[in-house]
Amino acid sequence: PRLTPEQEAMTDLLMCSLRLLADENHIAPAALASRKELERLATGDRDTELLHGWRGALAGRTLLRVMQGECAPLVSAGGLKLGCKDDISTLS
């Protein structure tokens, strides 16, 4: 089934966030998840390896927070970074 425009946009946001998380952890984004996996996440499918094991710890839980509006890519003087509501340093 085709994604809705909103699901496509959410997948793009998740992909951006995944790239930032991967860069932060010095790992290739593809080692964490494929775009297909992110599309599944954007459609509400929670049965993905991205939410389990080391992938879940490194990226999955944060990506769920992105979907809930608790984390988002932020533009800063040093470029893009992923900021979360509980990370006080992202507010300054």
Mark where each language-model region is.
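Accessory DNA-binding and partner-docking regions appended to nucleic-acid-acting proteins
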Residues: P1-S92
